[in-house]
Amino acid sequence: MSRLFEGVGVALTTPFTNNEIDYEALEKHVDYLLNNNIQSIVVNGTTAENPTLSDEEKDEVLKAVVKQVDGRVPVIAGTGTNATKKSLEASLRAKEIGADAIMLITPYYNKTSQRGLVAHFTTIADAVGLPVVLYNVPSRTNMTIDVDTMVELAKNPFIVAIKDATNDFDYHNKLKERLDLSDFSLYSGNDDNVVRYFAEGGNGVISVVANAIPGDFQALYEKSKRGEAIDKDFEPISRLLNALSVDVNPIPIKALTAVEGFGNYEVRLPLVTLESSDRKQLEEAYAKYKAGEL
């Protein structure tokens, strides 16, 4: 069996206009990503402001993206919650809508044990029967998938990838050593570490900044896959990422997607948009980046 997923996936933002989902902007954004050859789209994840979307909104966004993509790249639906029953229900709806895979975050707030993680993920994976990408992001959940647990979970035929947002290369290298990477994918969940991640055997990235610069990130991956050095190519992207670090994701990236015409610059509470001075500085940095001057 070969790996199902690799390359640049985009953690899609949800465009709003007057606090409602802007489906016209969503369609434009998806076309922009596809025209720049990204290799998968993740819908309803952290960057999509998942907690502020109703179940109906999540389903409608997924329907719109699945229709727009029309089989050209895999669509991965973020369906994980901190309740197994709710996650399973969302995953089954995603399957019915036409998602190619689901992404499951580790349960948060009501943290479980490593045994509980195995039970949670395998219950959903076995019942849904779609490829599963696990999402390990301890900075947001205060919970991690231990290496031994990941090895056990990878025995499940439906669990085919991990989005690793630990930024821990000891963890990454242990996974690389112990998993069969002929049919399992290691995705970085951190834009800022991709040079090293690709060099040390990572199969791709699920990117935030690629919402705005998909072509540049895809070119970076393709160059790395050819065995070419990408350090210099990454330097201006790194400076753009520094500018984006002004606030928590997805507040800054949505300022850039607004510049590109994908909805207004809006986020839903409890998130708030950047202060006007910070937004101005970020947009100036982005303009310099696009002009090749950053």
Curated annotation (Swiss-Prot):
**Binding-site residues for pyruvate, renumbered to this chain:** 47, 206
Q: Name one GO cellular component term.
A: cytosol
What are the site positions for Part of a proton relay during catalysis?
Answer: 46, 109
* InterPro entries, alphabetized: Aldolase_TIM (IPR013785), DapA (IPR005263), DapA-like (IPR002220), Schiff_base-form_aldolases_AS (IPR020625)
Please give the Gene3D superfamilies that the UniProt record associates with this protein. Aldolase class I
Q: What is its EC number?
A: 4.3.3.7
Location of the active site: 135 (proton donor/acceptor), 163 (schiff-base intermediate with substrate)
Q: Which GO terms describe its biological process?
A: diaminopimelate biosynthetic process; lysine biosynthetic process via diaminopimelate
**Pathway in which the depicted protein is active:** Amino-acid biosynthesis; L-lysine biosynthesis via DAP pathway; (S)-tetrahydrodipicolinate from L-aspartate: step 3/4
- SMART domains in the record: DHDPS (SM01130)
Subcellular localization: Cytoplasm
Catalytic activity field: L-aspartate 4-semialdehyde + pyruvate = (2S,4S)-4-hydroxy-2,3,4,5-tetrahydrodipicolinate + H2O + H(+)
Transmembrane intervals: none
Q: Which GO terms describe its molecular function?
A: 4-hydroxy-tetrahydrodipicolinate synthase activity
Protein keywords? Amino-acid biosynthesis, Cytoplasm, Diaminopimelate biosynthesis, Lyase, Lysine biosynthesis, Schiff base
Q: What is its main location?
A: cytoplasm
Alphabetical list of NCBIfam families matching this protein: dapA (TIGR00674)
- Role of this protein: Catalyzes the condensation of (S)-aspartate-beta-semialdehyde [(S)-ASA] and pyruvate to 4-hydroxy-tetrahydrodipicolinate (HTPA).
State how it assembles: Homodimer.
Similarity comment: family membership: Belongs to the DapA family.
Q: What is this protein called?
A: 4-hydroxy-tetrahydrodipicolinate synthase
Organism lineage reads as: Bacteria, Bacillati, Bacillota, Bacilli, Bacillales
